[in-house]
Amino acid sequence: MKKVEVVAAVLRNKEGKFLCVQRGPNKLKYIHEKFEFPGGKIELHESQQEALHRELAEELNLRDFVISKKLITVVHQYPDFELTMHAFLCTSDYPKFTLNEHINYFWLKGEELLQLDWAAADVPIVKHLLNHESRN
């Protein structure tokens, strides 16, 4: 079984809302047009933080953010591969970005996150936010 290691940015703006991005059409129906936190694969010889900066620059043209802390690592078994995802809480006061790889986005409060149709691997991150970050 193929194993993939990725990073995800749980990006919070100055209003305390989180950036949720929607994947485009995909041949893998279980991630087709699902919502996720932006991020992507860690390249060889790249740290998790370096991967996060590179991926947000590639996917969103976003460079103005700070990595605050690591939130959670999720291991999820999809039908075709095993995904290990390292999620980091990131902040940006005035995040300006462009959707280069996604088809839609929302800024949502923690309690609104469950309204979206999330990729299965992102659900534990959403639950973690609801259980921990909403108290801060």
Annotate each predicted stretch with a short phrase.
Residues M1-L19, K41:
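Conserved N-terminal beta-strand and adjoining loop/helix that marks the start
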Residues K17-E58:
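Conserved Nudix-box catalytic region and its N-terminal flanking loop in Nudix hydrolases
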Residues A87-L89, T98-L129:
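NUDIX/MutT-family hydrolases
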Residues L130-N136:
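Generic C-terminal helix-cap and adjacent flexible tail
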